[in-house]
Every structure is written in C-alpha cells, then in structure tokens.
C-alpha cells in the first residue's frame, strides 16, 4: 500500500496509507477523521483532475511518498452543552418526584386503605401542609396531650416523605401513633387488623390537628384547621307541639349529604342534611318533645368537605350496611342558596365580580379565535386560590403584587379530591383516593399504586353499583379580588 502526505491549509499530514483495493471514498473518510472536512467537501488534486469517490487507483497512478493537495472547509466543532444533560435515572429521588408532578403511594399494612386514602386527600391541601411544617414542640399548646403531639408530628413527617419519594412509602410510624391515639383502629378479627371507616379516620385526624395547630399565643390564625375546613351553621329549632322557637350556632368540619329515594344529586342531599328532627326538653311542656331543626351556612371554609351518608346500622345483620343509590356530584359546586341571609348579602358583590371576570375571559377567548392580539388569557383571580378565611381576607391572592385589594369568597367551589369506597359494607371493601394535582391532572391513589385518570372518570364515581363510589368529596373555594 502506498504511503502519501496530504497538504491541507497550513498543515501537512504525513504517513497516510492508501489501500488501493478500496475505492477513493474510503481514503476521503480517513481524511475526514484527520481534518474534519466531510468527503463531499474535499477537493483532492491528482493526475487528471480531482479525485472522484469511485475513481480507479490504477488509472490515477498514485505513488509511494507522493504529495497530494486537499482543499475544503471542516465542520464546526460541536460544543459541549452549557448545561449538562441530566437523565431521569440520574436524578435524586426528591427531584424525580417533582418532575413526575405527583407524590408517591402508600403501602397497605393490612386493611389500612381507609387510612391511606384519608392521608392522600388531606395531603393535597397546601395550607395544611404549611401549618404542619411550622409545627414544633415549642409551638405545642399546653392543653395538647402527648399522643396528639405525636400524631401531629407523624402526619407532618409522612406528608414530607410522600413529597420527597417516588417509591411507595410505608406509613408504619403514622399507623402506630394513630392506633395509640385512637385504639378503635387496633381492632382485630381472626388475628388481622379489621377494615375501618375512612370517614371516622378523617374526622379523628382533623380533630387532633385542630387541637395541635392552634397557636398558643397568637390570635391571628389561631385555629388553622377551623380556618381551612370549619363551617359555621346557624340553626333554628321549632317545637311542633308547643310552637317554641330557639336558635343556636355550631361549627362543623363537614356537611352531610343525606341519601333517600328522593335524592339524585349532591345539592339535594345537602338540603336534606341541613334539615332534621331531634328530641330535647321543652321548657313550656316540661318534658321531652320533638323539634324540627333547620340550618343555614353562616360562614364558609376554604375547603368544603362533604360526607355522603351511605352507611347505616342494619340490625338484622348487626353491621353497617351501604346505600348504593347513585348520587351525582358536580365538578363545580355553588352553595349560595344554602347560606344564611346575611352571608348571601356579603356574597352578592363578589359573585357579580366573578361573573364579570368570567364573561370577560370568555370574550377574550372568543377574540383570540378570530385573530385578536390578546391570545394569551391570564387566569382570573376567581380561579386562583387565596389564603384567608370567612368571607374576606386581607391576604393578596398573588403574592408579590402591589395590589391592595382584598380577596373575597364567592360561595362557588371546585372539586379537588374524592375518597371512594368499593364494596357492600363500611367494615369491608376497599377505599381509594382520587386527587387533583396543581397541574389540573387527576391521580388515583390506590394504596401504593398511583395512576393518572381523566376528569370525566371522576364524575363516574357517583354510585349505583359495585364500582368505586364517592364517600367523601372535598371542594376548594373560588375567590375574587375587590
């Protein structure tokens, strides 16, 4: 094989062997490796003109030690990226969890789906997570017992671990403390822990947190749980026998959707839940009498929880039986007509503002379709959540803005979580959480298996068969700035 040298620009490449049994294109490929000049750009001067890719070396007559000249421009050297590429498998677990857009599932420790689904729903409330993150032994109120303190800390730690992990988290520490605080969750049957009622777990956990998260010295935000979930009811009691009337107020953490053959929709069930009968002592009659109790909502929470009263005690079988009736519920819930007259008056102006903003938004979207410059429509204040309780708050919904407007509730709520039950009895079957993420996507948390769901699938959990059906729903308030 002849050895040649090639002059290119100011460089001379010596000692290049040419395999004359292969076409000249192979020689050009060698030069590409040495110079970076692609073969199609190489112009090599040989006897008879330019060297062709399929030329005949015998006809060209290249000789050992011959000097060849090449012209051509090399490709630009590819620069390393300014920011190194990081592959998903190389990310730390916490960063990977953030990229996924949803947190990890929870290991079922043996009939603990009631607890897992409760935790996943409550963990979706950012203000509750924030209150828990600020909780410490120093912030503990004197009237909070040790087990309540331990359960609050265990809740805080479990929420944090779920946010940091992509793999299923074992809630063993939380479960141990929950059973210590509430021994009923330790019941055994045939040597195994029994299935429990998710609503009872939800209620007991919220009650504990409401006691622990009270600020011992500050009056501002003194009861974080009440500010988030508390509903004040104004009730009128009427004795049918004596005609006596009285009124009372009470604070609850959820509304009840009572289910009967007349109830087909959540709104109807809520109306039934705000009316009822009870027996109490009548001062006029001097004995126990029947009273009719009618309640109206007098203040609104940031998160409205609704329990579908699906379980009742069945004497024949000595267990909690389940009402399977289908009860539809909306993605957007308006409870204006369930409010007291005073509260309605306070809601009128914010609701009018909300209608105007939504009308304006729809108008902008229409213009965008017809080629308007206003193609980017910003989220209205009504669609943004804001801190604050009651009917108004001085906290701005968009932190960092110069706006001095206050945020006001509208009586309109968006569905953000559903806890479902599948089965015929509260003490058996299976509980699952369905939670809306900040991105707007829905995730089903079936113990340790989170999976994406379509929004239309969420409204199909209304009952009527043996499929998952809503047992607890949680709605988030819409605010407007005024």
Curated annotation (Swiss-Prot):
Low complexity: which segments have biased composition?
Answer: 382-393
Q: Which InterPro entries does the UniProt record give?
A: Papain-like_cys_pep_sf, Peptidase_C19_UCH, Ubiquitin-like_dom, Ubiquitin-like_domsf, Ubiquitin_CS, UBP14-like, USP_CS, USP_dom
Keywords from the UniProt entry: Calmodulin-binding, Hydrolase, Protease, Thiol protease, Ubl conjugation pathway
Q: Where is the composition biased (Basic and acidic residues)?
A: 350-361, 371-381
Q: Name one GO molecular function term.
A: cysteine-type deubiquitinase activity
Question: Cross-referenced SUPFAM superfamilies, in alphabetical order?
Answer: Cysteine proteinases, Ubiquitin-like
Q: Which SMART domains match?
A: UBQ
| Record family assignment | Belongs to the peptidase C19 family.
What is this protein's record name?
A: Ubiquitin carboxyl-terminal hydrolase 6
């Amino acid at each position: 094989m002849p050895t040649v040298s090639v002059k290119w620009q100011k460089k001379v490449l010596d000692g290049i062997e040419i395999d004359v049994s292969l076409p000249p294109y192979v020689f050009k490929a060698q030069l590409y490796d040495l110079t970076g000049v692609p073969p199609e750009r190489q112009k090599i001067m040989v006897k008879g003109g330019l060297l062709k890719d399929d030329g005949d070396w015998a006809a060209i007559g290249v000789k050992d030690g011959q000097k060849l000249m090449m012209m051509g421009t090399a490709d630009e050297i590819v620069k390393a990226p300014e920011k190194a590429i990081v592959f998903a498998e190389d990310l730390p677990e916490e960063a990977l969890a953030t990229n996924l857009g949803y947190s990890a599932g929870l290991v079922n420790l043996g009939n603990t789906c009631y607890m897992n689904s409760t935790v996943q729903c409550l963990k979706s409330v950012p203000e509750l997570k924030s209150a828990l993150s600020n909780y410490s032994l120093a912030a503990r109120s004197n009237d909070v017992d040790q087990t309540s303190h331990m359960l609050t800390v265990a809740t805080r730690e479990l929420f944090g671990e779920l946010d940091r992990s992509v793999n299923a988290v074992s809630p063993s520490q939380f479960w141990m403390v929950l059973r210590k605080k509430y021994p009923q969750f330790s019941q055994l049957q045939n040597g195994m822990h029994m299935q429990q009622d998710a609503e009872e777990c939800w209620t007991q956990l919220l009650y504990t947190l409401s006691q622990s998260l009270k600020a011992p010295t500050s009056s501002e935000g003194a009861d974080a749980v009440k500010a988030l979930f508390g509903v004040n009811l104004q009730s009128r009691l009427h004795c049918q026998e004596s005609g006596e009337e009285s009124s009372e107020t009470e604070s609850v953490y959820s509304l009840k959707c009572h289910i009967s053959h007349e109830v087909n929709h959540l709104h109807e069930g809520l109306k039934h839940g705000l009316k009822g009968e009870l027996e109490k002592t009548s001062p006029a009659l001097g004995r126990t009498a029947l009273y009719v109790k009618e309640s109206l909502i007098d203040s609104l929470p940031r998160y409205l929880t609704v329990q579908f009263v699906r379980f009742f005690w069945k004497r024949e079988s000595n267990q909690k039986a389940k009402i399977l009736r289908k009860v539809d519920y909306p993605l957007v819930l308006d409870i204006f007509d369930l409010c007291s007259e005073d509260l309605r008056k306070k809601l009128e102006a914010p609701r009018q503002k909300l209608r105007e903003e939504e009308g304006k938004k729809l108008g902008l979207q229409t213009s965008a379709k017809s080629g308007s410059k206003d193609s980017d429509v910003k989220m209205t204040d009504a669609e943004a959540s804001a801190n604050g309780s009651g009917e108004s708050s001085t906290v701005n919904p968009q932190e960092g803005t110069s706006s001095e407007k206050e945020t006001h509730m509208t009586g309109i709520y968006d569905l953000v979580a559903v806890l479902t039950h599948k089965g015929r009895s509260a003490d058996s079957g299976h509980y699952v959480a369905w939670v809306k993420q900040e991105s707007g996507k829905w995730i089903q948390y079936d113990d340790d298996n989170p999976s994406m769901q379509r929004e239309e699938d969420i409204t199909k959990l209304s009952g009527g068969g043996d499929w998952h059906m809503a047992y607890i729903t949680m709605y988030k308030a819409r605010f407007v700035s005024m």
